[in-house]
Regions:
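Conserved pre-ATP/AMP-binding loop-to-beta segment of ANL
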Residues: 36-39, 164-182, 189, 212-218
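AMP-dependent adenylate-forming
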Residues: 4, 27-51
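Conserved AMP-binding/adenylate-forming
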Residues: 45, 49-50, 63-109
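Conserved AMP-binding A3 loop
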Residues: 50-54, 178-202
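Conserved structural elements of the adenylate-forming
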Residues: 57-63, 193-214, 219-223
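Structural core segment of the AMP-binding/adenylate-forming
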Residues: 69-70, 97-160, 167-170
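Flexible, low-complexity linker/hinge segments
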Residues: 13-22, 156-177
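Adenylate-forming
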Residues: 28-31, 41, 56, 60-63, ...
């Protein structure tokens, strides 16, 4: 294969992307309606988990209702500090569905770096894995305005709300802020990069076209979410 093969193939992609969804939550709900029993997520390991589209959408919907009932409002920021897990993905989609801005934080960062990102992003609530308790304990007292919620498993999230009411995510627009990704900060403090729902959906469609994904494709995620 020639070294410039990927560049040549990339230049063939049409960038006239037509979006059929109003936001990321709209994408999830419509795909769950179209493919309720199709496999959506597999989390291998000691606590092996699998979700169909409908199962995942149900948990996301329940968790979204909890986030709203807890007092969080559209455009509020929430930080997520997890290793790759179903809990991270449920909270990620749930937050986006109700118009929150997600601030994912690499759990391998130091307590000082985590504290800086929470403060800089003005995150109101911080969800974190119970495996990170010792790291979070070091910064809790100095972040008195933030609410910390430890999450052990997907069952914790399901138990947060028992409502079956379907969430209406129509109040979230394509141009609303969706995620703030912080850089590694190799030459200083990490810098936040803002992505909208439009950015996320356009990226997803571009990647899907680039790799020629089909309904039968499976993607292996190794890097931190």
């Amino acid at each position: 294969m020639k070294s410039n093969y990927l560049i040549q193939e990339h230049q063939k992609i049409s960038y006239q992307i037509k979006l059929d969804y109003n936001n990321v939550g709209d994408l999830l709900f419509k795909k769950a309606e179209e493919n309720p029993n199709k496999k959506f997520l597999i989390c291998p390991g000691e606590n092996h988990e699998e979700f169909t589209y409908l199962e995942f959408e149900t948990v996301v919907n329940q968790t979204s209702q909890f986030l709203i009932k807890s007092g969080l409002k559209k455009n509020d920021k929430i930080s997520l500090i997890f290793h790759n897990s179903s809990e991270f993905l449920v909270l990620y989609f749930a937050g986006l569905c109700c118009g929150l801005t997600i601030v994912p934080i690499n759990p391998e960062m130091s307590s000082r770096e985590i504290k800086y990102i929470i403060e800089d992003s003005n995150s109101k609530t911080i969800f974190y894995s119970d495996t990170l308790e010792s790291k979070i304990t070091k910064i809790k007292d100095s972040l008195s305005d933030a609410h910390f919620k430890k999450t052990k498993s997907i069952k914790d999230l399901i138990s947060l709300s028992d409502t079956r009411k379907k969430l209406d995510c129509n109040q979230v627009s394509l141009h609303d802020m969706a995620v703030i990704i912080y850089t590694s900060g190799t030459t200083g403090n990490p810098k936040g990069v803002i992505l909208s729902h439009l950015n996320l959906l356009s990226d997803a469609m571009g990647i899907s076209e680039w790799f020629q994904f089909t309904q039968d494709s499976r993607c292996l995620c190794i890097l931190p979410l």
